Amino acid sequence: RSTLMRSSAASDVYKRQSFTITEKGYSLANGKGELLPAVAADFAAGPEKPASYIGKVASLLYTRFKNGQLPIAMVSMDNCSHNGDKLYAAIHTFAEKWAENGLAEKDFVNYINDREKVSFPWSMIDKITPRPDASVEEILKKDEIDGLDPVVTSKNTYVAPFVNAEECEYLVIEDWFPNGRPELEKGGIMFTDRATVDKVEKMKVCTCLNPLHTALAVFGCLLGYTKISDEMKDAELRKMVERIGYTEGLPVVVDPGILDPKEFIDTVLNVRIPNPFMPDTPQRIATDTSQKLAIRFGETVKNYLASEDKDIKNLKLIPLVFAGWMRYLMAVDDNGEKFELSPDPLLETVCPVVAGIRLGDTDVEETIRPLLTNRAIFGVDLYEAGLAGLTVQYFKELIAGVGAVRATLKKYV
């Protein structure tokens, strides 16, 4: 297999390589900044027999370098911003380390850096493909299709002979292919420049999809929902995300030109999120919310503050989401029952802030001030942005007692 891959890598016919390895796949170090053992070993051993995934990719590029510096496009299609840069950074690090250690020529680094020879285009992909769902499996079994049982891998991921994915799909790629490409636009892929890819990403992440998902996740957990699609049958929750998207987000949306933001939201709210065959949960989407609020809502807040003709006071429901998240951190649902918070790297920091707050408390502003002023979480200091007062008001109403979350939604959406 290794011989075949090297043979392919040495051929000029080999024009592009795509990657879907998750954002973590590009990491060369662990959370403490320590090199992964396989990566450290590869740095020392050189490109001949690498053990790490990125090391193997860098080794194949070294093969192309040794066979006439053949051009190629390295296309990351993982769902993360500026994905091409992440792939480049990992590959470039390998090239530099090998050159520093005398295990590869310095010209190999130049080859990786030559835009005419090796490209790392950005892409934006948007297609929800959750793990194989039992309801879909049952439908297929009724059609007398056998052997569908899913398998849990050693890494606790689920695989099956079938895939349940939404029909809607978007793939936008920076048109940077040094060795040419087929006319994939005929299959619906959109090719454009880097700036436009970035705009599409911002449109999706900051306005048209991700903020709506996060809002539903926070309040879905508080109201006991276990499927995002069911939340769209809830009049208050549906109205909430409609107003966040259309009324508060669209006026300052980043318009990429190749996709219409309003049509994108229309599809999200009327087709994608309500799809019962997409068994996504508010609990899954609520994962790492502290890392998401600054991008998914904070950018809209900043755009209002920077605009000469937009009034920050028109933001009514984004502050409600901020307050809802702080209410969520109490780990008590709207029935007064405890629930388990989704994983989040800041739980040990933010949960103690609200730990002493009980339903019915009213004197809470000073208690939650450390959260309200946290730019890392919200993207802005909510006091400086002029949103702290409304956020505190909402929070007080959300903790007024059992049923207060539903009552607050009814009152304001």
Label the model's feature ranges.
Residues Y88, H92, E96-C206, K227-S229, ...:
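Primary mode marks residue(s) on the alpha4-beta5-alpha5 output face of response regulator receiver
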Residues R64-M74, F94-N110, L222-K239, V252-P256, ...:
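Inter-helical turn/loop segments and adjacent helix faces that build the functional surface
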Residues N30-G31, K56-K66, P178-V197, F219-G220:
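Active-site-adjacent bridging/hinge elements
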Residues I244, N270-V413:
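Long, compositionally biased intrinsically disordered regions
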Residues G245-F264:
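A structural-propensity feature for long, helix-poor, extended segments
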Residues N79-S81, K204-G220:
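Conserved phosphate/anionic-ligand binding catalytic regions in large, soluble enzymes, centered on
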Residues S2-A10, Y14:
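Single conserved hydrophobic/aromatic residue that forms the stacking wall/gate
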Residues K15-H92:
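Divalent-metal (Mg2+/Mn2+/Ca2+)-assisted nucleotide/phosphate chemistry catalytic cores
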